[in-house]
Structures are given as structure tokens and as C-alpha cells.
Amino acid sequence: ILTSELNRTNASVLHITPFRSFPSGITASASKKSEYIRWANTSGGIIIEDDFASEFTVSTKNEDTVFSLEPTHSVIYVNTFTKTIAPSMRVGYMVLPKEFVGAFEKKMGFYSCTVPVFEQYVLTEFINNGNYERHLNRIRRKLRQLQK
């Protein structure tokens, strides 16, 4: 995404996949992420960061998300467990800036959750007891071995 071109539009929302962006497979550099943040700050825009599959990095250091770099709360972070646990685990999540929560609840509060409560409880326990992080670490080790 060329931010110079983005600045010439009336766009108020920018949807990005900074890790292995489809279809190019390119991961956004730190400077590109900073450009996105500058655009949001100067235009008053919102960034929706879709961070799916970022857990599959072969690097021993995780990539910084745009969400983690943006102190002014103009980034909505979304991700899913579909890629990291199983395709049948149709659970996604969104981290909203506090100022967006009320509007989200007002507009989306009437939608019913399609994820069974039991799956939500099992996933919560899997995360809370550290098994999810261990699972990701095993996958990353295997990916590094395959890359050699």
C-alpha cells in the first residue's frame, strides 16, 4: 500500500495484513508500519490489522504488530485460532480501543455468538494454562527445522 496514494483518497479505514500479506507474501517493515500509523494520526483514520498466521514466524523474535506500536488507539486488531489450532476451530477475536467498545456493543450486541460455549471454555483453559503458547512454540521449532 502506497501511503502517498492513500493520502490522496478520502479513505477513513485501512485494512492491512502486515505479516505475509496475501498475495505477495511480503511482511511489512517497521518503517511501513510507521507509515500506516502516521496516516491514521494525520487523517483521523482507523487501521484494521488482520494478523492471521503471524504466529507462524520462523524468527525467534515475534514481529511487532501495528497495534502494539500505536499509542493513540487508532488500530483495531483481529486474529483467529483457525490457522493455529485447527480449521474446525472457527474462533476469531478482536481487540478494540476502549473508545470503540460502546459503539461496537450498540451495533453488534444483538448478534448471537455462533461458537459453542463449550469450545470457548476449552479454548480459554488451553490459553490460560500455557498449552497454547507451548503449542505455538512446537510449531515454530518444527518450521525452523523444515527451513534448514
Please identify what each model-predicted range represents.
Residues 2-58:
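Active-site phosphate-binding strand-loop segment of PLP-dependent enzymes
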Residues 5-13, 30-34, 43, 61, ...:
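Bacterial carbohydrate/catabolite-sensing allosteric modules
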Residues 24, 52, 62-65, 128, ...:
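Glycine-rich, flexible loop/turn motifs
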Residues 25-26, 59, 116, 136:
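Alpha-helix N-cap/helix-start motif
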Residues 28-31, 61-64, 91-93, 107:
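Short, glycine/charged-enriched secondary-structure capping and boundary segments
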Residues 66-71:
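Short, conserved catalytic or adaptor-binding loops enriched in Gly and charged residues
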Residues 75-148:
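PLP-dependent aminotransferase class I/II
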